[in-house]
Amino acid sequence: MYLRRLRDLREDHDLTQTDIANLLGIKQTVYSRYERGYQNIPLEHLLKLADHYGVTLDYIFERKD
């Protein structure tokens, strides 16, 4: 599931949820809800995360390794 991939990317880069929330301009609690699947992640945020991690959306959505 892509939510697991987002968490793995964050942890692989030694970042906290607060770090990513700051990057996206949102509260940590909102980002936590994204990672846990309680709130949909806007496409704008997914694109920003993909750029930040240097990966494609296909990679995030596990369409490509």
Ranges and model annotations:
Residues 2, 6, 56-57:
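Hydrophobic side chains within well-formed alpha-helices
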Residues 44-59:
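DNA major-groove recognition helix of helix-turn-helix/homeodomain DNA-binding modules
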Residues 35, 53, 61-64:
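DNA major-groove recognition helix of helix-turn-helix
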Residues 6, 20-21, 31-34, 60:
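Conserved hydrophobic/aromatic packing and binding residues within compact polymer-binding modules
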Residues 25-40:
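Recognition helix of helix-turn-helix/homeodomain-like DNA-binding domains
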Residues 1, 12, 38-41, 52:
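Helix-turn-helix/winged-helix DNA-binding modules
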Residues 4-23, 48:
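Short basic helix-loop element that most often maps to the first helix and adjoining turn
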